From Swiss-Prot:
Pfam families: GTP1_OBG (PF01018), MMR_HSR1 (PF01926). It comes from Albidiferax ferrireducens (strain ATCC BAA-621 / DSM 15236 / T118) (Rhodoferax ferrireducens). Its cofactor is Mg(2+). This is GTPase Obg. Gene3D superfamilies: GTP1/OBG domain, P-loop containing nucleotide triphosphate hydrolases. An essential GTPase which binds GTP, GDP and possibly (p)ppGpp with moderate affinity, with high nucleotide exchange rates and a fairly low GTP hydrolysis rate. Plays a role in control of the cell cycle, stress response, ribosome biogenesis and in those bacteria that undergo differentiation, in morphogenesis control. One of its GO terms (biological process) is ribosome biogenesis. Residues 160-334 form the OBG-type G domain. Keywords: Cytoplasm, GTP-binding, Hydrolase, Magnesium, Metal-binding, Nucleotide-binding.
Length: 355
């Protein structure tokens, strides 16, 4: 499956209905006066943030989205009915921008959030509106106003607390399936993951965080090599990066330290801010390393890699070390969330007396 994190759509709100020219026709009243109603407004186009979606793939197959126009006004003071609105479901985190100018118009960040992306036109006035002391029998009316039409670009940045990065076949998909509800495709060959996978990790009652598994990076990813560069942008909103390293590669001639350094260099080239994010080292597949050699292997790797941050030894396959890892991650994420919250202003009338 090809992950679509970018899509273009054309939306058209409904035009307003035209006003009506009409006069009352009653027995014994030759000049009954105007009674033409207004036209109905055109339908709006809404976008709603749906937490159950995590791709924009549906919009690749349905580009045009048109709301209904309003009905025309009629005689007997009858106003036209409003056109039916349409609501487009989009993943949480969708950025909506003008496809021609690139200007960001909206951003869906909260589940259930609803925004109006194209407003329907107002209905036209019927001749009832033009009645005055001077003009008792107006024959004026106005057409409905046109609805908004927009060519939009949709872009999705995955909203995850934790991002997994590493070389292809490092065991990232096995890790996310071991600690979360995600069930990505897993196989014993590189580039199994072709699109981002999101998983919710439940640490305890009302304690959880979201983790994103992205396609593996290779050297030259920041210049467009491989698949990973297409999804590096998804890591920009994460609070923590887990650098997963395969400590038991099939090819014994592979230099795991050189591969790990290549990943870090790609981050630095792509975005210095991404490089400076909190990054932890997760040494995976240690179940395949003999116990008597494990400590020396880990110590040698960390020394050659010159890594100063937290280091975790796990086996995603047997889940060894995973439980303690997710608890520490949750504590870090909660601390980050608390630090990001802006303190509420305190009304000085109710502020505690510090004297």
């Amino acid at each position: 499956m090809k992950f679509v994190d970018e899509a273009y759509i054309d939306v058209s709100a409904g035009d307003g209905g035209a006003g009506c020219v009409s006069f009352r026709h009653e027995k014994y009243k030759e000049f009954g006066g105007p009674n033409g109603g207004d036209g109905g407004r055109g339908g709006h186009v809404f976008a709603v943030a749906d937490p159950n979606l995590n791709t924009l793939v549906d919009f690749r197959f349905s580009r045009r989205h048109d709301a209904k126009r309003g009905e025309h006004g009629m005689g007997s003071d009858m106003f036209g009915a409003a056109g039916d609105d349409i609501t487009l479901k989009m993943p949480v985190g969708t950025i909506i921008s003008d496809a021609e100018t690139g200007e960001v118009l909206f951003e869906l960040l909260t589940p259930g959030e609803v925004i109006t992306i194209a407003k329907g036109g107002d209905g036209g006035f019927g001749n009832l509106r033009f009645k005055s002391a001077i003009n008792r029998a107006p024959r004026q009316k106005t057409p409905g106003w046109p609805g908004e039409k927009r060519n939009l670009k949709l872009e999705l940045k995955v909203l995850a607390d934790v991002g997994l990065l590493g070389m292809p076949n490092a065991g990232k998909s096995t890790l996310i399936s071991a600690i979360s509800n995600a069930r990505p495709r897993i196989a014993d060959y590189p580039f199994t993951t072709l699109h981002p996978n999101l998983g919710v990790v439940r640490v305890g009652p009302e304690q959880s965080f979201v983790v994103a598994d992205l396609p593996g990076l290779i050297e030259g990813a920041s210049e467009g090599a491989g698949l990973g560069h297409l999804f590096l942008r998804h890591l920009q909103r994460t609070r923590l990066l887990l650098h997963v390293v395969d400590m038991a590669p099939f090819d014994e001639g592979v230099d795991t330290v050189a591969q790990a350094k290549a990943i870090v260099n790609e981050l630095k080239k792509y975005d210095p801010a991404l490089y400076n994010k909190p990054r932890w080292l997760v040494l995976n597949k240690l179940d395949m390393v003999p116990l008597e050699h494990r400590e020396a292997l880990v110590k040698d790797f960390v020394k050659r890699f010159k890594f100063k941050g937290p280091v975790f030894q796990i086996s995603a396959l047997t889940r060894e070390g995973c439980e303690s890892l997710i608890k520490i991650i949750y504590q870090h994420v909660k601390a980050q969330q608390k630090a990001e919250q802006t303190p509420e202003a305190v009304d000085q009338r109710f502020a505690p007396d510090t004297e």
